[in-house]
Amino acid sequence: MVIRVFIASSSGFVAIKKKQQDVVRFLEANKIEFEEVDITMSEEQRQWMYKNVPPEKKPTQGNPLPPQIFNGDRYCGDYDSFFESKESNTVFSFLGLKPRLASKAEP
C-alpha cells in the first residue's frame, strides 16, 4: 500500500497550505513513499476523499479539508491526528507502517 496525501494545490488558505507542506516535508525527510492527490484537479478524487473520511472525522458543516491521509484505502487521519502522532513519535503506527529502526554506525 502507498501513503496517499490528499491536498488542494489551489487553496487560498495559508493555514491549509502550511499543513500540507508539513505533512509532505515530514514524509520526504523520513523517506516514506507517498503520493500526493490534488483534489482541485480531479472531482472524482475529491468525492472519493469526502466519501472515505469516517463520519466522526467529518466537520458538522461542509466537507473535510485537506490534508487528509490514507494508506491505500485505509483512512489514517487528518492533519491534527498526524501532528499528534508526530509529537508522540508514533507516525509509523499512525500511517499503518512498520517502524524503522535507526542504525548506528560502527566505531
Curated annotation (Swiss-Prot):
UniProt short sequence motif SH3-binding, positions renumbered to this chain: 61-67
Tissue-by-tissue expression: Highly expressed in brain, placenta, liver and kidney. Expressed in retina.
Cellular component per GO, a single term: nuclear membrane
SUPFAM superfamilies associated with the record: Thioredoxin-like
Record-linked Pfam families: SH3BGR
GO molecular function: SH3 domain binding
Subcellular location(s) per record: Nucleus
Main localization, broad class: nucleus
Keywords for the protein's UniProt record, in alphabetical order: Nucleus, SH3-binding
Gene3D superfamilies in alphabetical order: Glutaredoxin (3.40.30.10)
Family label: Belongs to the SH3BGR family.
Record's protein name: SH3 domain-binding glutamic acid-rich-like protein 2
Lineage: Eukaryota, Metazoa, Chordata, Craniata, Vertebrata
